[in-house]
């Protein structure tokens, strides 16, 4: 008996599951099903498959090949895009470039988590989204403030707190499922631009950094926030409570929406707005709404005044493996290099 399998289609029109496939289904047959599901003409189909997504050869010479032979397996996600039809008087383009494919993959992959909110800020709401992400209410209180309180959502104090926090502000979930994907996204971006991400910027070679950031025990910081801000098309404002300032990543890109993270010197937590006990927490806010930003500034000042931060240059640590006392991050790192000890506790 021939085993059946399915694939997922992700397109601007929406997301679809194609179930009635088997190991003998041809690429030509799948093309027909994609056309039926997405209403895109066969001659204008542009399909990406795999991770990182790569363009699928849809030429007539390939149409009789079985799906598995062209690299499509059960459970695969296919990113489907419509190529612009060439103008009658213009020469036919030679095809999309690698840069086009990478930009397309980033755009559609980010769409599942952030596109609906981007469109809410500047146009009609898309019908294709699987779910609506939390967004701040439009009602304003006195002085333009939102009718809600900006609060900290505590996330696990592990090596992925930055990625967990970003996942929460994008989709309202506290889990570690998106950390590996975000690390991979960052590594791809860095590897693709060795001139910008050189040894001086990274503190290590480009290749070493790309391997390092994909390890589960590597911390994220400014470089990673900047890349993810650009990838998701949203401003990420990091509220630095040690210095009582807000670092706006993506400010120069004029994004329409922003999220807030709280940083105490060693740990990130996401910020959200609670508008009522029954409403879902709001985590994404229009940039032009200054009331929320002012709340974040106030929170930073209050946290600094009460010293709710860790000064990584002056805090005192104890090595939990040999009981030696250390002052600051530099001493701790040097001790770790010399001894291999990695378990420290703050005193």
Curated annotation (Swiss-Prot):
Residues 155-161 are annotated as: Cys-loop. Residues 213-223 are annotated as: Variable-loop. It comes from the Eukaryota. Residues 290-295 are annotated as: S2 site. A zinc finger (C2H2-type) spans 317-341. GO terms for biological process: endoplasmic reticulum unfolded protein response; ERAD pathway; positive regulation of double-strand break repair. Residues 263-267 are annotated as: His-loop. Substrate binds at residue 266. Hydrolase that can remove conjugated ubiquitin from proteins and may therefore play an important regulatory role at the level of protein turnover by preventing degradation. Involved in the regulation of DNA damage repair. This is Ubiquitin thioesterase Otu1. It comes from Drosophila melanogaster. The gene is Yod1.
């Amino acid at each position: 008996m021939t085993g059946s399998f399915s694939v997922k289609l992700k397109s601007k029109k929406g997301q679809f599951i194609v179930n009635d496939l088997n190991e003998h289904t041809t690429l030509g047959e799948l093309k027909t099903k994609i056309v039926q599901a997405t209403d895109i003409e066969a001659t204008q189909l542009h399909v990406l498959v795999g991770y990182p997504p790569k363009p699928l050869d849809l030429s007539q010479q390939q149409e009789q090949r079985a799906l598995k032979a062209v690299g499509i397996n059960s459970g695969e996600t296919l990113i489907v895009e419509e190529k612009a039809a060439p103008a009658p008087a213009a020469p036919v383009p030679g095809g999309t470039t690698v840069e086009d494919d990478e930009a397309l993959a980033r755009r559609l992959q980010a769409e599942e988590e952030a596109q609906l909110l981007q469109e809410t800020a500047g146009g009609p709401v898309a019908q294709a989204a699987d779910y609506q992400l939390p967004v701040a209410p439009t009602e304003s209180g006195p002085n333009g403030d939102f009718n809600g309180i900006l609060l900290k959502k505590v996330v696990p104090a592990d090596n992925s707190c930055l990625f967990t926090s970003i996942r929460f502000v994008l989709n309202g979930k506290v889990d570690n499922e998106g950390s590996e994907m975000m690390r991979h996204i960052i590594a791809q971006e860095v590897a693709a631009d060795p001139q910008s991400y050189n040894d001086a910027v990274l503190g290590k070679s480009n290749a070493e950094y790309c391997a390092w950031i994909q390890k589960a025990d590597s911390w994220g910081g400014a470089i990673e926030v900047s890349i993810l801000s650009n990838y998701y098309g949203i401003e990420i404002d990091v509220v630095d409570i040690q210095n009582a300032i807000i670092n706006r990543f993506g400010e120069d890109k004029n994004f329409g929406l922003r999220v807030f993270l709280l940083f105490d010197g060693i740990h990130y937590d996401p910020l959200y707005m609670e508008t009522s006990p029954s409403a879902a927490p709001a985590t994404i806010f229009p940039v032009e709404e200054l009331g929320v930003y002012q709340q974040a500034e106030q929170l930073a000042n209050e946290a600094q005044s009460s010293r709710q931060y860790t000064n990584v240059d002056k805090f005192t640590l104890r090595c939990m493996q040999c009981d030696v006392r250390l002052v600051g991050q530099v001493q701790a790192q040097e001790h770790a290099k010399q001894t291999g000890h990695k378990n420290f506790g703050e005193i």
